Each structure stands twice: as C-alpha cells, then as structure tokens.
Amino acid sequence: MREIVHIQAGQCGNQIGAKFWEVISDEHGIDPSGNYVGDSDLQLERISVYYNEASSHKYVPRAILVDLEPGTMDSVRSGAFGHLFRPDNFIFGQSGAGNNWAKGHYTEGAELVDSVLDVVRKECENCDCLQGFQLTHSLGGGTGSGMGTLLISKVREEYPDRIMNTFSVVPSPKVSDTVVEPYNATLSIHQLVENTDETYCIDNEALYDICFRTLKLATPTYGDLNHLVSATMSGVTTSLRFPGQLNADLRKLAVNMVPFPRLHFFMPGFAPLTARGSQQYRALTVPELTQQMFDAKNMMAACDPRHGRYLTVATVFRGRMSMKEVDEQMLAIQSKNSSYFVEWIPNNVKVAVCDIPPRGLKMSSTFIGNSTAIQELFKRISEQFTAMFRRKAFLHWYTGEGMDEMEFTEAESNMNDLVSEYQQYQDATAEEEGEMYEDDEEESEAQGPK
C-alpha cells in the first residue's frame, strides 16, 4: 500500500498532530492502545496508509514527534492517545528555540536534525511503497517554522521523488504569541515555496473569526481552534484513508491541484462548522453543504475567495448521499459563479464522495481551493514583516545565531514575487495565455500582470 509518514514539529505542530491522530484513530476504529475495535471493513481497507501493523495486531501511527523542548511532547505522551505512538519516535531537545527561526533552522535545530532523520529513515524502511510525507507545524514560532523547514529540505534531499505535503499554521495578530511572528513566517514561506509540493494554509486569523462569529464563542481557546484544524485535516485526508477513485494519493492530488510549481498553497474549508462537544441537530442537505463550503466564512485561511479566482478546486463529501445531487450542485455553483474560476483550466473542480461521515455528523464536506486570493494572506504577513525590517527591529536575535540580513531581504522579495505570480494568473484570460508564453519570461515578469 501507499504509505504516508507523518512528522509533527514544535508546540503547535505537536498539538494539532496529536488531535489529528485522535480524530482519525476514532474514524478507523483504533482505540488508545492501538487495538482495532471498529465495525466496518472500510476502516481497515487502507489503514496501512497511516498505520503500521505491529506483531501483536496493534496499529501504530507512522508518526514522528519532534520538538526542541520536552514540554509539549510530555503532554502528548500523557494525553488520551499518548500510548498509541512508538516510544522511539519522540525526539526532543532541552534548549527550546525561543520563537527564533534561526535557532530552529541553523543552531539548535541543526543539532537535533540528524537524530530525527534516523527515525524518518527507519519509518520509511517500514513502508512497502512510500508515497510521501506530511508535516504539521506553525510558521510563527521557532521550532515548527525553523526546524520544520530544515527537516523538509533534508528529507527532500534524501527522498527527492516523494511528495512533501505540509499543514502550516499561519500566524495572525489576533492570536499572537510573539512579536517576531512575521519574521519567522516570511523566512518559512521562503522555504515552503521551493521545497514542498502541497501546503494547506491554516490561518489562525480565520480560525479565530470562525470561532468568534460563526460558533459564537466569546473567548476562543487554542483547543477550539485545534478542533477546527482537526476536522479540516480529517476531511482533506479522507480520500487518502478510505477507498475511492479521486485524489486517492498525494501525487494525484498534486497533479489535479498545482498548475504551476510555486503556486501550491491551498485554502481549506469545511462545512458544517460545529463547536467542540456540540451535537448537530439537523442533517444538512447537499445544496446547503455546497453553499457553505464555498462561503468565505467557512475558509480556514483569512482570504476572501471573491477577491481572486480559483485555479483549481478539490472537494470531498462525506456521508450517505446521492452522487447525482452532489454533481448537480457542484455544476450549479460553477455556472452561477463562473467568473470566479479561471476559464483557461477547463473542468478545474473535482469532487470525491466517501460513505463514512466524521464523528457526530451525518454529512460533511471539505473544500480544498487553489485560489489567487491567498495572496491576501501573504500580503498581510509581508506588510508586518516590512514594518519591522525597515527599522531592523529584533534582527540581533537572528544575526546572533549567524544569520545574514541578506537572507531576510531574499525571503521578503521571494514572498513579493509569489504575490505577483498569483496576481498575474488572476488577471490572465484564455486569449492572452498564448501571448504570455511567447514573451520572454523576464519581460513578462517585469511588466507585471497584463
């Protein structure tokens, strides 16, 4: 089977990673000690994608837990599903990265990275036919962002032909831990643009807004935000974990979703949005699910898709429902909103249906969009970055770990290039496409969008 090796790095990465394993273990009928207690063959048919079956018929996640300080991993280990993980796969330092990207990427993280790679190798040798890696991390801290991106480039070196997929939590001033988040995020995005195949942008700003506006939670906690993240991660991995035809592995998803190699930052969405521990009273209809999942309020990235255009979209519907109705609704949305889909990629919306709904819902839908509106998120970070960088505020923490200012300038311009590329394809029309390629590449970039 086609296995995926999961890596979680840093405090945020370990918390959303642990939550992800709780949710999918529940969906596959795996109890906290790794025994199968489910009731459907569908749960086991592709279980080997994420789990390794040990000799005692126990299922062990193909997960590697990494952090530069022991705190978060101790709480994962003592949490509900702590005994599920392989004890050797907990790798941690003692020093911490102090929210400093340079410590995670160049100094502290670099010392720990080889012992992580040993475990990665061991997990990959356990695989029959590895399809790729997924990393959960945040971009605002030190370990997840700095060491996370270091791991990506090291793993990439060793497994160049395997897919690299990340769930990256993007920082926001609304839910901020540190003042240097824009630095860490910009340096990380500089790496992600070059070294990953698929990145789901999970945006703390959007999660906070959903909790506050839609779920009416007065003071959202990280637990509430992580509940949304785990619902989304469970949704976007559905077609990898359950039998089906569409986007059944990471590479097929990448082929459908990524028209240009640098533009691989996806906007996830989920419907229906429910608060933690609440029961849903009424099953939604397919039209309602479709309506909601294309709604800006349901996006996990704080960007308004109406400000851009979709290059590609993949959706997953879960639960017992009529395929015909799903197809009709999806076509209806596309024909009503055709101006929001680029016309030079025909059939750019793909739909998968899985019979098994998530816990507590009769039906749900998950949305993965590659929209040019994601540039709003990069612009937001870029503005915060520039405000500090032009005064060289806080730079000594980074140069003190051996970094050069030049690296900051490069990261800044790479992110600005990314924004212009999204803008260029947002403005492109089918007629102009031909001319665009005839021009010299540099020339068209110098002119910006036509």
UniProtKB/Swiss-Prot annotation:
Consequence recorded when altering T178M: In CDCBM1; can form tubulin heterodimers that are properly incorporated into microtubules; the microtubules are less stable than wild-type
Domain topic, free-text comment: The highly acidic C-terminal region may bind cations such as calcium. The MREI motif is common among all beta-tubulin isoforms and may be critical for tubulin autoregulation.
Protein name (Swiss-Prot/TrEMBL): Tubulin beta-3 chain
GO MF assignments: GTP binding; GTPase activity; metal ion binding; netrin receptor binding; peptide binding; structural constituent of cytoskeleton
Family according to the record: Belongs to the tubulin family.
Binding site for GTP: Q11, E69, S138, G142, T143, G144, N204, N226
Database matches in SMART domains: Tubulin, Tubulin_C
Disease involvement: Fibrosis of extraocular muscles, congenital, 3A: A congenital ocular motility disorder marked by restrictive ophthalmoplegia affecting extraocular muscles innervated by the oculomotor and/or trochlear nerves. It is clinically characterized by anchoring of the eyes in downward gaze, ptosis, and backward tilt of the head. Congenital fibrosis of extraocular muscles type 3 presents as a non-progressive, autosomal dominant disorder with variable expression.
Organism lineage: Eukaryota, Metazoa, Chordata, Craniata, Vertebrata
